[in-house]
Each structure stands twice: as C-alpha cells, then as structure tokens.
Amino acid sequence: MDDFFHGELGLRGSLILRSPESFIETTPSQANQPGFATADTRNARTPERTFMTFVRPLTPFEHLMLMDMRRGYPMCFFLEVRLAGPLHRQQFAAAVLSASARHPQAQMRVGYSRGRPVWLAPDQMPTVEWVDEVTTAPTVLWRPIDLGRESGVRFVVIAEPSHRWRVVLQVHHSVCDGLAAVEYFGDLWACYSAATPAAFRSPARPARLVRAPTAPVAAGSHLTHESLAFARFFPEKLARPGTTTAAAHAALSNSLRTPYETFEFSSAFSLALRSAASRASVTLNDVVIAAVMQALLAWNAAAGHPAKRIRVNMPVSLRSPGARGPACNDMGYAFLDRTSDDCTSFCRLTLSIATASRWIQANRAAEWFLDTLAVLSRRPWLLWVITRLPICLSTAVVSNLGNVTPRLRARAHPPGHADPFAQSIADGKQVPDQWNVAADLQVTGMWAVPPIRPGTRAAVCVTTYGGRLHMAVLCDTQSLGHNAAARLALMIQDALQHAADGLTCEDPPAEVPRA
C-alpha cells in the first residue's frame, strides 16, 4: 500500500491543532438557537439543514475511522464511475460545487477542542484533479487525505482515448459511508445535467426486534454468546505468496495503476448467478461472501500457509428504507467467523451465511457494534490501544452496495415527466442497461471498494449497475505484493463461476445463526 498511500498519518501528527479562535464551538447557550443541533452520541443521521454553521464532535464511528488511519492505511474508500462521451471541465467543476452545498460534511475539516476531534465549519471544497494516466505517477493521484488541512472528499478524473473517462471519488471514511457517497455522486450528475437532485427524506428508523424470527434464543442471550465467541476466535491473515505464484500473474498488473482492481461480469453471467441464488433461497450477497471466503482459503493454501480460521467484516447499512439525506455515516459492522471445515461445502457455507445475515438484519445487530464503540470512545486512549494491537481482527472486508442505478439517477422531475436522459426500458425492467448523465454522456459502469487496515489485508465490494455485477478488490501490497488484488480477483471469479454453474443447496440451514 505504500506505493500508493505515502506520508506520515499518525493519530494527530498530520492534523493541525488549532487555537479556539480558529473554529466555532457550540456552547449550551447556542444549542437551542437556529442553525445549531445536537449530535447523536452514536451514529445517526442528525444534520437536517443544507448548511451547518456549527461544529459538532465526531461520532464514535467517525472518530474510529480517524484514529485508525496511519502510514499506508489512510482509511479512504473509492467509488469509480466510468463514462463515455464528452465531459466538460467547467460544467463538472460547477456540479461539484452545487452538489457539495447539499452535503456540508464534504466541505469540513477536523480540528480539536478540549483534546477531542470536532468538525470545523464548512470552509473547504472537494478538490478535482484532471490527470493524464500515462504521465501522472500513482503516488500523486492516491495520496492520503489530511482532514486537518483539506476536505475529506477528492475527485480524480482520468482521461482515456475516444472520449472515455474514469471519475474516481476518494473519500475519507470519517466523512460518510459508501451509500451516502453514491447519493452524493447522484446529486453531482443531477447538477451536471441542470436537473434538481432528489429531495432529502428521513423515514422513521425501524426498531430492533426483541427476538429474531429465525433465532431459537433471546437476542440478548445470543449477543452475549456471540461476543464471547468473537473474543475467543482468532482469525488468520492472508499470507504473502511465494515468488513463483507472484510471477505467474505478473501480467495482471493494473495498467492504470489504481490501488484496486476492477472487473465486471456479463449480463448473462450476472443473471445466472442471481438465478442460482434465488433457487437456493439465498441472496446474491450470501453467495458473494461465501465465494470470497473460499477464495481467502485458496489464497493461503496456494501460499503454503493453509488457514484454519477466517473472519469477514461485513458493513451493514442502518438506514431506513427510502432514507436520503446529507452525507454521513449511518452504518455498523457485523462479523462472520468460519473455520476451514465450515467452508468445505459451498452450499452449506452459503446457507449458514444466509441464516446469520437474516438474523443480523432482523435484529439490527450491527447497531450493537456502535453501542460498544460508544462506550470505548469515552476513553479515547483505550480505543487507540485496541486499534494498535498487533492482531488480525478480520481476514477481509466484504461490502455490497447493491443496485446503485436508482441512487445515481435520483433527481426531481415535474409531475408527469420522466428523466429526459434515461434510455428506454427494455424487457419490462425498471432499470435500463445504461444511463445517460446528459444527452451525450453515458455511465458505463460503477465500482466501489472499502478501506483496509493493518492485519485486514483485503477488501472486496460488489455493486450492480445496468443488470451487470461489478466487483472491486483492494489488497495490502506491503504484505501481499504488488499484484495481490489481481490474483485474489481471479480466485473470487473462479469461486463465483462454480457457484453459478452448480449452486444447488438441499441441506437445511443451521439451527443457530453463526455471525
């Protein structure tokens, strides 16, 4: 990772510690005044206004993302949109300004008040870098984001021949989560085409259930059991491959030199994979996680260090259905632990993941991660120590943003009028195969990938656009080598191919969900 992410990023070393006069601080007398709000102590979406003229402390999740960054691990995720057609610089720059006005946190820096990090009043617009991929060094493109000096959002626009473009959005995870970044992208394209972005909506958040429909024990008892299991389970890292394995795939090196590898499946294969998942009564996400788990085990076996225990960190959105608002983090984490014996049968592995995923969603169990984080954040030094422990907390991160097309296309239209740039819908589907940002500019694909941290050496993200499955892979090149992402991507593709060819799950799911 050092090849892309260089520079010192200590806990506070790169953040300018500013005097009290250099930022606004909300006082009790101001708390009830117009323009001020009280922040949720955990992670909820609290900004209701377009502009925030006040400062609030970072939520525990935002603080964790800030604290966990270090040299080579900047805690940034990436979203990439590929376009065909002319992209006008001034029009794009104006769209960035307009879209950012709806998302104040994209304009904020981080300072410190009484020893704790706070968001400063919006004063930094996201930067846009127009580059020629042939001549620009990757260390210039993908440098870390210093939240003490600049916005946590950066655009890198890479020009390719024949009016092709790669627009990469690099976001510090303290700013927002992946779904919020997709909506920010959607607002940008709405502004680019002189349309009105979709209105913000804040439906009521569903409450947790006391008992999961599929769980035979009370939720609290199961949580205690899973917490103890988490503490006793020590996942193994991905092992560095030998020189022979590395040389075998040297030709797969990323020619555009992004930190991550991207690939997409054909519409026919994507449909076959979804159909196989449907026949097995599981979701596409369950199949993808199972395929990644088998690929992780195959990786270590090929490296000569067979793993017995793996853990996948699964980001879980806590949004209410239909919610849309200013960019922020509204998510938690769930952890899926499996042994190598659990992964022998792909079908049984997929069913066990499906059972656990349903329990997690039904109980909103990912919120318990935030509850724990809120307690730890009262002692920042303890949180810092935990993030610096020389142990592997997760083998890999696997995220799924789902069908991104509706979020990208979200814009307001006059009653009775359709999107003038949307192509005709074929076969009765609600989402066209391609979508035009403007009359002459078309989105051809979209990828995303979450950040990694020391010990968690791989990150995988799945998106669906135009009926096709898109996947991006990010690996720790310091530990695994320069072509690690390309090699792991091949293994995941092979596992998904086997799933599409013969996923027939007749075995009953596990009685107790294993998260």
Where are these predicted regions, by residue range?
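Short hydrophobic alpha-helical segments enriched in small aliphatic residues
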Residues: 3, 7, 37, 41-44
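Acyl-thioester-dependent acyl-group transfer interface
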Residues: 45-113, 135-153, 298-515
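Aromatic (phenylalanine/tyrosine) cluster motif
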Residues: 4-5, 23, 36, 51
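N-terminal amphipathic/hydrophobic targeting modules at extreme N-termini
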Residues: 6-12, 20, 29, 47
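Acyl activation and transfer enzymes in specialized metabolism, enriched
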Residues: 85-103, 169-186, 262-302, 471, ...
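Acyl-thioester-dependent condensation/acyltransferase catalytic cores
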Residues: 93-196, 261
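Non-catalytic, low-complexity flexible loops and terminal extensions
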Residues: 45-62, 67, 175-179, 183, ...
